Amino acid sequence: FAGQAIWDDKKMCLPFGGYWHMLHYRTDLFEAEGLEAPKTFDDVLAAAKLFKDNPKYPELEGGYAMNMARGSAAGQQFYEWIYSAGGKPWESNYPGSPDAYADQRGLYNSAESVAFIEWMQEMINYMPPGVEQYAWDERAKAFTQGKVAMINNWSVRTPLFNDPEISKVKGKFGVALFPHAAGAESVPPVGGWIACVNKHTKNKEAAWDYLKWFASPEIHREW
């Protein structure tokens, strides 16, 4: 993650807010059904089928929620999942490797990509109505309100699921490693933010002072 702020061996930006992607699942529901945390795509699909339209859980609108809105929301899902599907989006290796982005010929028609898209198409049947409009906020909101049994989400959202003022699932969920396809390994996405000072700004020192303050341990922990 920190390496993304370096160009030509020079640190160009200030990394902050490193996050990772995890499976969030309702431990109370899984325990009631005698299930363990899903590990594979097949596990996620089977659990989603079980919880969708299950009369024992009328509050659930779906077994799983995913970003499905057109554009960057659905697009990010592909990039988040394709490595754990045993594939990759382009010829170059994983971001952070020496040849990352060197060859961006798309691999969207690869066997792994096609299998993942077909899995997504099957999963839609077990998601809430209107999931085609879901992006990051809608996905998290569905889980926070207890409307789905599972989501994959960035760790920055996890504390909100335990906030009693907004969450109906406080103390009722767990996290697990990013699911993977059969025969593949889990490759959890890691992300975050980088902050820079534009060289054309009129207030470079003030901007730098702000970044140092914002990235300080006490402020960043609160943020």
Region roles according to the model:
Residues 1-21, 45, 74-86, 170-177:
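Hinge/lid segment of periplasmic solute-binding proteins
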Residues 10, 33-37, 121-135, 147, ...:
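A local structural motif
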Residues 21-25, 82, 195-197:
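Short glycine- and hydrophobic/aromatic-rich loop-to-beta-strand nucleating segment
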Residues 41-46, 131-145:
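Short helix-initiation/N-cap motifs at beta->coil->alpha
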Residues 48-50, 92-133, 178:
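Glycine-centered hinge/linker elements that transmit conformational signals in sensory
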Residues 149-154:
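Paired acidic/hydrophobic, glycine-rich loop segments that form the ligand-binding mouth/hinge
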Residues 156-170, 181-223:
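C-terminal lobe and pocket-closing loops
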